[in-house]
């Protein structure tokens, strides 16, 4: 991720690598508790309905039990923050794939970053006062009988327009 391109080569992305299992467990509990408090309305996206319900039941583990979580942050005032973080995330996911590791981009901390409890925990872990979380990457060994699933996935959408 640290070799990913950044706008103007600013390299402002902050990588918080969390491997401490107690800290990961705390984050899972915090995320679960805060999602579990959310109301479900007619405007709640279907995937969020499941997350909220599972959280309320104490069954939502946002990092899928992975032993590593890399949280990427940047300055909200920096115009390319999300683009830079996205480049770093993609590079790390490709590297994980090459190393036969499973990876999953998880957004729960980003979605909850204005939550006081989540914000306090992230600050305690090293998030700067002038930073916000833009993405998190869960990394671990795939829990599959034959390791990493290497199946081809057909694109479902992504409109492409060619202009000659």
Task: Label the predicted regions.
Residues 1-2, 137:
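Short alpha-helical scaffolding segments that buttress acidic/His motifs in well-ordered protein cores
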Residues 65-68, 101, 129-133:
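Short coil/turn connectors at secondary-structure junctions
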Residues 32-33, 86-89, 153-155:
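Short, solvent-exposed amphipathic alpha-helical segments in soluble enzyme
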Residues 11, 15-84:
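Glycine/small-residue-rich phosphate/adenosyl-binding loop
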Residues 55-57, 127-164:
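C-terminal helix-cap and adjacent tail motif
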Residues 3-8:
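Glycine-rich phosphate/pyrophosphate-binding beta-alpha loops
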Residues 1, 70, 75-121:
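Small-aliphatic-rich amphipathic alpha-helix that forms the alpha element of a beta-alpha
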């Amino acid at each position: 991720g640290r070799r990913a391109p950044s706008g103007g080569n600013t390299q402002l992305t902050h990588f918080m690598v969390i491997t401490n299992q107690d800290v990961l467990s705390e984050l899972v509990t915090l995320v679960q508790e805060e999602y579990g408090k959310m109301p479900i309305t007619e405007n709640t996206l279907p995937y969020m309905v499941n997350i909220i319900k599972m959280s309320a039941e104490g069954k939502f583990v946002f990092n899928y039990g992975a032993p590593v979580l890399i949280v990427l942050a940047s300055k909200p005032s920096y115009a390319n923050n999300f683009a830079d973080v996205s480049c770093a995330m993609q590079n790390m996911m490709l590297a994980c794939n090459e190393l036969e590791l499973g990876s999953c981009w998880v957004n729960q901390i980003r979605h909850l970053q204005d939550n006081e409890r989540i914000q306090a925990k992230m600050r305690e872990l090293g998030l700067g006062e002038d930073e916000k979380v833009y993405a998190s990457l869960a990394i671990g060994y795939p829990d599959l009988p034959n390791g990493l699933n290497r199946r081809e996935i057909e694109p479902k959408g992504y409109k492409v327009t060619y202009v000659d």
